[in-house]
A protein has these predicted regions:
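Short SAM/SAH-binding signature in class I
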Residues: 2-3, 131
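Conserved beta-alpha-beta core of the PfkB/ribokinase-like small-molecule kinase fold
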Residues: 3-83, 99-101
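Conserved phosphate-binding/catalytic region of the ribokinase-like
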Residues: 25-29, 49, 74-166
Length: 166
């Protein structure tokens, strides 16, 4: 798999939106998959409809935490939000901290356990490292379940110390 990864934080600036749409369009024209991380529930609130358009038109893999996906879908329950997003996105990954993550594909939802951490020091970068681990596994031929476990392992490592670098 070749994947173009888009960062939701960049969506606030109109020029960045234009650039991200162009990158996604070029990726699709080159038979690449497109991944998007929503990054921030407040950004999702500001740009809900345009995010939905971007996801529906281009995104194959969506990464979010619970707050972000609930905001995107204007739902109160994660499962109901997953049902909505899975109708227009192939793979939806929702990180849930100590509760692990959910990965929705088509009609299946996988639950990935969080890797236990003795002392959580700093959660900065946990979602980013989860996405990096998942994408590493996915692009190296691992199935979605194993890719989720790699993501969980990466997230556990980064929260065990100060700072976002492993």
């Amino acid at each position: 798999h070749q994947i173009t990864y888009l960062e939701g934080y960049l969506w606030d600036a109109p020029l960045a939106q234009e650039s991200m749409v162009k990158a996604a369009s070029l990726a699709k024209a080159s038979n690449r998959q497109v991944a998007l991380t929503l990054s921030d529930s407040f950004c999702v609130e500001r740009h809900r409809e345009s995010f939905k358009d971007l996801i529906g038109d281009y995104v194959d893999l969506l990464f979010s935490n619970e707050d972000e996906i609930l905001s995107l879908c204007q739902q109160d329950e994660t499962e109901s939000a997953l049902q909505i997003v899975r109708s227009f996105c192939d793979i939806v990954v929702v990180t849930r901290g100590a509760k692990g993550s959910l990965i929705a594909t088509g009609t299946e939802t996988l639950k990935i356990d969080a890797v236990p951490v003795n002392d959580v020091i700093d959660t900065t970068g946990a979602g980013d490292l989860f996405a990096a681990g998942f994408l590493f596994g996915f692009t190296h031929g691992y199935d979605i379940n194993e890719s989720g476990k790699i993501g969980s392992t990466m997230a556990a490592e980064v929260i065990s110390h100060v700072g976002a670098r492993p």
